[in-house]
From Swiss-Prot:
Protein name: Cytochrome c oxidase subunit 2
Binding site for Mg(2+): E198
Major place of residence: mitochondrion
InterPro entries on file: CcO_II, CcO_II-like_C, CcO_II_C, Copper_CuA, Cupredoxin, Cyt_c_oxidase_su2, Cyt_c_oxidase_su2_TM_dom, Cyt_c_oxidase_su2_TM_sf
Keywords: Copper, Electron transport, Magnesium, Membrane, Metal-binding, Mitochondrion, Mitochondrion inner membrane, Respiratory chain, Translocase, Transmembrane, Transmembrane helix, Transport
Gene Ontology BP terms: ATP synthesis coupled electron transport
Transmembrane parts of this sequence: 15-45, 60-87
Family in the record: Belongs to the cytochrome c oxidase subunit 2 family.
Length: 227
């Protein structure tokens, strides 16, 4: 979840988000080491009186600064590609949800059910109840079963949108005339908030997303009540 004055990421709620956090820490450490080395060399240049203006070539140094960056790039690229392919994998989803972006709300269709569709609008600030979050609450939450593979099909009816839920590591563009897909798995129940992450007009800031992840038996009761 998110906290007031938070500087880091939200708590990971899916295996993909956990992998992304590990990759972030891995890459950040590499960047920190490189930056420290560069600052150390600059400080030496500014403080020492030794110069090498007569040096015409240094094969050993040139070899090192050619090979070392290549190794560093490989250390960054390999885990990045691994996560990229993991995010594209969709193996036997238990449930498929079709999401359509509109100006300025979302509509959802549970394609495994005969007639389970609804629109999801932001609740105005004047209608919020105590404890509800401003600009993040909706009238119809997307209820999903936890610990199950869920496929999201995402498109748009009008302009470009982007369906994003940070704590699940999800961000997929909603493009008119094109159907994108992503997968999500939640490791624990709860409410997870997101927003449209592509500027789509004057009310772009008023397109929140709320996922309610519940145990399977509660999801079955909810789906039965909606039909």
């Amino acid at each position: 979840m998110a906290y007031p004055l938070q500087l880091g990421f939200q708590d990971a709620t899916s295996p993909i988000m956990e992998e992304l956090l590990h990759f972030h820490d891995h890459t950040l450490m590499i960047v920190f080491l490189i930056s420290s080395l560069v600052l150390y060399i600059i400080s030496l240049m500014l403080t020492t009186k030794l110069t090498h203006t007569s040096t015409m070539d240094a094969q050993e140094v040139e070899t090192i600064w050619t090979i070392l960056p290549a190794i560093i790039l490989i250390l960054i690229a390999l885990p990045s590609l691994r996560i990229l392919y993991m995010m594209d994998e969709i193996n036997n989803p238990s449930l498929t949800i079709k999401t359509m972006g509109h100006q300025w709300y979302w509509s959802y269709e549970y394609t495994d059910y005969e007639d389970l569709t609804f629109d999801s609008y932001m609740i105005p600030t004047s209608d919020l109840k105590p404890g509800e979050l401003r600009l993040l609450e909706v009238d119809n939450r997307v209820v999903l079963p936890m610990e199950m593979t869920i496929r999201m099909l995402i498109s748009s009816e009008d302009v470009l949108h982007s369906w994003a839920v940070p704590s699940l590591g999800l961000k997929t563009d909603a493009i008119p005339g094109r159907l994108n897909q992503t997968t999500l798995i939640s490791t624990r129940p709860g409410l997870y908030y997101g927003q449209c992450s592509e500027i789509c007009g004057s009310n772009h800031s008023f397109m929140p997303i709320v996922l309610e992840l519940v145990p399977l038996k509660h999801f079955e009761k909810w789906s039965t009540s909606m039909l």
